[in-house]
């Protein structure tokens, strides 16, 4: 039985959003055990009558705020995030999920859990929908702002292993850049390009421009965390704006909206990022996942699903084994 700990506090929505997702997922997957970390007075009434739910509660009323510094996060050893990470550190659970502060989460997991290898940097890996049937996986989207070319290469290799292990296909890998030409970008772009180009274990496409992402030009995109976060938030903002435009036109022309309802439904369903809101924190010794700071039950649910799929496919074991082939 896999054990999943969920940090139920420290994000923009209420505790109930995290708990509702756990309840819904547990109903379909009774082979899982959950540890809910947060205010028991808020959690207990939501779960006490759910006979199918295998759970325990780790009580705390303290949380790490989104604006708290990393130093403050370290001092809050009784916070929901810190206690959640300690559960994984002490092998009381198999994976953890949080929607809290990204900077605090990366710093605490890095120090309490540790990295697979000292040469790598950890990265957030998120799924982005496209106009094609299959979207693409994108990292780093915010864990680390700067990378050396070798570090981006290692990140790409780990992400490649993640996709082949969990989803059973060989991804077409690209590197984010302002142009597709080989000489574009900074020095680290040239380094990672040459390393990937000469690696026969990956299907390397070359540099990918942001305008080609929604068209599905690649299955896996590698970037530094600063650029990656900018692009991801720009895409999310653009897709939300499209949704608002569609809703506005419904009101102006309800008859036209009626006839195009199915098409509109398919568009909104395809680009609903909440269906794939989980980010794997690649590079750590144990399985750690992050979801949006504004996560609702739907986003927590999709993150739990990704955690479960990763556990079923022994993700960390496979990535560690893969790292041993190119790191020493």
From Swiss-Prot:
Pfam family, one: FA_synthesis
Leading EC class: transferase
Pathway field: Lipid metabolism; phospholipid metabolism
Compartments it resides in: Cytoplasm
Subunit text: Homodimer. Probably interacts with PlsY.
Natural source organism: Mycoplasmoides gallisepticum (strain R(low / passage 15 / clone 2)) (Mycoplasma gallisepticum)
Signal sequence interval, chain numbering: none
Reactions listed under catalytic activity: a fatty acyl-[ACP] + phosphate = an acyl phosphate + holo-[ACP]
Family, similarity comment: Belongs to the PlsX family.
GO biological process, one term: phospholipid biosynthetic process
Summary of the function given for this chain in its UniProt record: Catalyzes the reversible formation of acyl-phosphate (acyl-PO(4)) from acyl-[acyl-carrier-protein] (acyl-ACP). This enzyme utilizes acyl-ACP as fatty acyl donor, but not acyl-CoA.
GO cellular component: cytoplasm
Keywords, sorted A to Z: Cytoplasm, Lipid biosynthesis, Lipid metabolism, Phospholipid biosynthesis, Phospholipid metabolism, Transferase
Protein name, as recorded: Phosphate acyltransferase
Gene from which the chain derives: plsX
């Amino acid at each position: 039985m896999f054990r999943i700990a969920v940090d139920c506090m420290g994000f923009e929505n209420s505790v109930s959003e995290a708990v509702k997702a756990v309840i819904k997922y547990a109903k379909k997957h009774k082979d899982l055990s959950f540890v809910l970390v947060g205010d028991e007075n808020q959690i207990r009434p939501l779960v006490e009558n759910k006979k199918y739910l295998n759970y325990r509660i780790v009580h705390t009323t303290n949380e790490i705020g989104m604006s708290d510094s990393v130093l403050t996060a370290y001092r809050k050893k009784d916070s929901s995030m810190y206690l959640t990470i300690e559960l994984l550190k002490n092998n009381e659970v198999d994976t953890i999920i949080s929607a809290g502060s990204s900077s605090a989460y990366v710093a605490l997991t890095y120090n309490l859990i540790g990295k697979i290898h000292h040469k790598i940097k950890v990265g957030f890996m998120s799924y982005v929908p496209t106009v094609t049937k299959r979207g693409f996986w994108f990292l780093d989207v915010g864990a680390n702002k700067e990378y050396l070319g070798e570090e981006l290469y290692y990140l790409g290799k780990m992400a490649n292993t993640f996709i082949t292990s969990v989803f059973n296909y060989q991804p077409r890998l690209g590197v984010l850049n302002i142009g597709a030409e080989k000489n574009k970008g900074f020095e680290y772009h040239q380094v990672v390009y040459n390393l990937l180009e000469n690696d026969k274990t990956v299907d390397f496409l070359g540099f990918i421009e942001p305008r080609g992402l929604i068209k599905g030009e690649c299955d896996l995109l590698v970037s530094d965390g600063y650029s990656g976060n900018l692009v991801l938030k720009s895409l999310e903002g653009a897709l939300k704006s499209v949704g608002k435009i569609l809703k506005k036109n419904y009101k102006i022309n309800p008859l036209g909206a009626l006839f195009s309802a199915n098409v509109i439904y398919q568009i909104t369903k395809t680009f609903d990022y909440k269906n794939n809101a989980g980010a794997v924190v690649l590079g750590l010794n144990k399985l750690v996942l992050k979801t949006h700071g504004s996560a609702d039950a739907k986003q927590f649910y999709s993150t739990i699903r990704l955690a479960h799929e990763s556990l079923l496919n022994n993700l960390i074991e496979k990535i560690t084994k893969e790292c041993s082939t190119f790191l020493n």
